[in-house]
C-alpha cells in the first residue's frame, strides 16, 4: 500500500502542486518571479559556482533524459549494449554530477558564510540550496554505488515507471526492485519539485525573450 502511494499517487500530487503553485505564484507575486541576483555583493565565488553548477546540471538533465525517457529498446536497435550504455553513463554522468555538486558547495558556502550575502538571504534561499545539494549528492552517491560493471540498470525499472506516469498509467510494481539509494534520490526530487514554485527556482521559466528584440542600452560617460 505504501509503495502504491509513493510511486503511483505521489507523482501526481507533486505535479499538481508544481503546476498549481507556479500559476498561483505568477498571479500573486510577479515581482518576486526573479533569481534575485546578488552579483553586486560578490562576484568571484558566484561566477565559479554558478558556472560549474549550471553546466554540470545541464549535462545531468541530458543524461536523465537519455536514460529515463528513451526506452532501452532504442539503444538495442542502435547496437548499444547494456554494458556499453553503462560505461557511457558513468563516464559522462559522474564528472557532470561532481561538477554540479562542486558548484553547489561553492554557492552554498557563499550564501551561508559571506556576511553581506547572508543578510540578504531568505530562509527559502538557504533551504533551496541545501535541498539541491542534497539531491545532487544523493544522485552522485547512487552513481558511485552503481559503478560496478554489473550495476543496476534503471532503464528497465525507473525508466518505464516514469514513462507510465507521464502516460497516466502508473505502475508502482516497477519500483519494487529498485535499490534504496535510487528511491531516496527520487523522493528528494519530490521535495524539490513541491517547493520549487515557492522559491527563487521559478526564475528557470523566466526567459528574457524581449532582450532579443529590444533596442540597445547606450551608456555615456560624464564629460
UniProtKB/Swiss-Prot annotation:
Required co-factors: heme
Keyword Lyase attributed: no
Coarse class of the protein's main subcellular location: membrane
Topology Extracellular: residue spans: 69-81, 148-180
Reaction(s) this enzyme catalyzes, per UniProt: nitrate + a quinol = a quinone + nitrite + H2O
Xref: Pfam families: Nitrate_red_gam (PF02665)
InterPro entries (alphabetical): Heme-iron_electron_transfer (IPR051936), NarG-like_domain (IPR023234), NarG-like_sf (IPR036197), Nitrate_red_gam (IPR003816)
Protein name (record): Nitrate reductase gamma chain
A cellular component term, taken from the record's GO annotations: plasma membrane
Subcellular locations according to the entry: Cell membrane
Annotated transmembrane regions: 2-27, 46-68, 82-111, 124-147, 181-196
Residues involved in heme b 2 binding: 64, 185
GO molecular function terms attached to this record: electron transfer activity; heme binding; metal ion binding; nitrate reductase (quinone) activity; nitrate reductase activity
Residue sites binding heme b 1 per the record: 54, 203
GO biological process terms held by the UniProt record: anaerobic electron transport chain; nitrate assimilation
Cytoplasmic compartment segments: 28-45, 112-123, 197-223
Originating species: Bacillus subtilis (strain 168)
Keyword vocabulary terms for this entry: Cell membrane, Electron transport, Heme, Iron, Membrane, Metal-binding, Nitrate assimilation, Oxidoreductase, Transmembrane, Transmembrane helix, Transport
Cofactor notes: Binds 2 heme groups per subunit. Heme 1, called the proximal or heme Bp in, is located at the cytoplasmic interface, heme 2, called the distal or heme Bd, is located at the periplasmic interface. Electrons are transferred from the periplasmic to the cytoplasmic heme.
Biological role: The gamma chain is a membrane-embedded heme-iron unit resembling cytochrome b, which transfers electrons from quinones to the beta subunit.
EC number: 1.7.5.1
Gene: narI
Membrane topology: Multi-pass membrane protein
